[in-house]
Amino acid sequence: MSVVVLGTGRRYSSLDAYSEEFSNASGFPRIMLRMSKDQINSSWDRHTTVVDGNLSLPFSDGWGWNILMGNHVFRGLKEKLKKSIVHYTTFGLPLLTNNPDDIVTVHDLFFLDPRDEAFGGFFNLSEHFLKRFLRFNKVIAPSEYIKGELESYGFQGEITVIYMPAPIEIQYLNNKEEARKMMGLPNDKKLVLSISSSLRRKNLPVVEKTMKILGDEYKLVRVGPPISNALNYRGLAPEKINMIYNACDVLLFPTLGEGYGKPVVESFASGLPVVTSDIQIMREIADDAAILVEPVPEKCAEAIRISIDSEYEYRKRGFEKTKTYSREKFISAVNKYYTAVSQATGI
């Protein structure tokens, strides 16, 4: 059996981590395409093959161009992929093969929502990129929620849900004081963690308003694009992210929509209580291991107080829920899936 895990994204990004996990779980090679200027400084270890697209365009960051012109830009790689099953770990990649038995992961469909930044209006580029891959027979989805969204969209092929585990570096350390010392965080505050991009659906205004309600006893720790009056971090390696999780008292994740909810799963693995939105995807991923609320400031603030007062209980629930997303289950699911694809195709 020969499978190639094809990915893109900055080092330590969610997309990078996703392709790395599938490659590590299966032992199959990973190829990372550097397709935009923000990936120029990303580098990987010797176990990952890196192929550069055109990163010197004066009129573009390169991403759209390298997808649309991928068959030309990556023509050498295209030849090498002909004898393998290719797992495209995002549809934001150039389509380099014509094998309907290849695999694509669809992480979300938010670009179909007119309220989302990715919605293309008259011409939806993301939808155009997606449709190229829906000629495949097989799709991997990160959650049952996204599987349902794909079915509603009209995809009639085989959709398999494979839950991602927390990164191996994310674990409970049982030493909050030491974690705070290592990350330069105060010991005299209750620390609320916010970790996300700045997309509208991440609902960051609610995070800011919630902190104002909570008052001076609390301090916001922010991983991602900065928020005013927070202790801000960006570009952290997984080991540092783990220190942040272990240093904080609660994760506030008032999202309006997710394909999976990686920070929630990571919080469970690190023993951090979670306050998140009472929406379909969070009911699937978190269930009663988190406090689910309407994502408005007043209810978030109340839930944060409850979660900190009941820290032990929610830590215990989180650890129990983590079994659903265990590394052992993930490795088994990945290898079972790749083996079935190989047997069906004869590759």
Label the predicted regions.
Residues 1-347:
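Carbohydrate transferase catalytic cores enriched for Leloir-type hexosyltransferases
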